Amino acid sequence: MSMPATSTKTTKLATSLIDEYALLGWRAMLTEVNLSPKPGLVDRINCGAHKDMALEDFHRSALAIQGWLPRFIEFGACSAEMAPEAVLNGLRPIGMACEGDMFRATAGVNTHKGSIFSLGLLCAAIGRLLQLNQSVTPITICATAASFCRGLTDRELRTNNSQLTAGQRLYQQLGLTGARGEAEAGYPLVINHALPHYLTLLDQGLDPELALLDTLLLLMATNGDTNVASRGGEGGLRWLQREAQTLLNNGGIRTPADLDYLRQFDRECIERNISPGGSADLLILTWFLAQI
């Protein structure tokens, strides 16, 4: 793979450190997809609301993406002297090349396009922070990623083109900003909600898988998931948020017996053809940042 982007200076980061963060990104993707049972999502039990996807597609995709994560980190480091708003344009060709490898690995199935965007941003942010000898924490990573995306929502969603993209249509109809808005805001759903929730459950001694499933419910209840809205409309999104919040209000996922509630939720999502893919992407970031 050749580096399809220019940069302003060479990186001084150790290859071992870069590979360590890339490995965490790969593990985050695998941890999310293997987590079971997940309502409407591909997992070890079934394909959720995705008739065109299988667990193995996600495994192959994650491996293909792992090879590109060091490139995002390296570009973040090499562009550390650039204005943060200028970094995103340099990341785009890396992301597109990574996306191409994902599609080749899955024979054309879109498994992790959202994760390429979000993990790519976070990896570039890590590279920039390391290069500048600044503290690498979940908060500084997300704040740096946000600085890369300044103005992104205005540029890409608030347009009046005659042919709207799916994201533009959902923004104009429902006010949903999706992955762009969450990134530009510094991932507040992760930093302020999902990550502290997950870490608190772990501190309380809850099984890590149960803690992650409960955190997924929290994200589903609070996230304006454009994946859900594109499949189920505003009604489908409100239904999903309401059902997830009801499960949380009733105690959440604390014991293996509680998994029966998730299995029933999964069946209902499949019947409605609803998949909370945006929340799954944020869960990947939550696990990733929890390791840092």
From Swiss-Prot:
Catalytic activity: 3'-dephospho-CoA + ATP = 2'-(5''-triphospho-alpha-D-ribosyl)-3'-dephospho-CoA + adenine
Organism encoding this protein: Escherichia coli O6:H1 (strain CFT073 / ATCC 700928 / UPEC)
Described purpose of this protein according to its UniProt entry: Catalyzes the formation of 2-(5''-triphosphoribosyl)-3'-dephosphocoenzyme-A, the precursor of the prosthetic group of the holo-acyl carrier protein (gamma chain) of citrate lyase, from ATP and dephospho-CoA.
Family stated for the protein in its record: Belongs to the CitG/MdcB family.
InterPro entries in alphabetical order: CitG, TriPribosyl-deP-CoA_syn_CitG
One function term, GO molecular function aspect: ATP binding
Keywords, ordered alphabetically: ATP-binding, Nucleotide-binding, Transferase
Pfam families referenced in this protein's UniProt entry, alphabetically: CitG
GO biological process terms, semicolon-separated: prosthetic group biosynthetic process
Protein known as: 2-(5''-triphosphoribosyl)-3'-dephosphocoenzyme-A synthase
EC number: 2.4.2.52
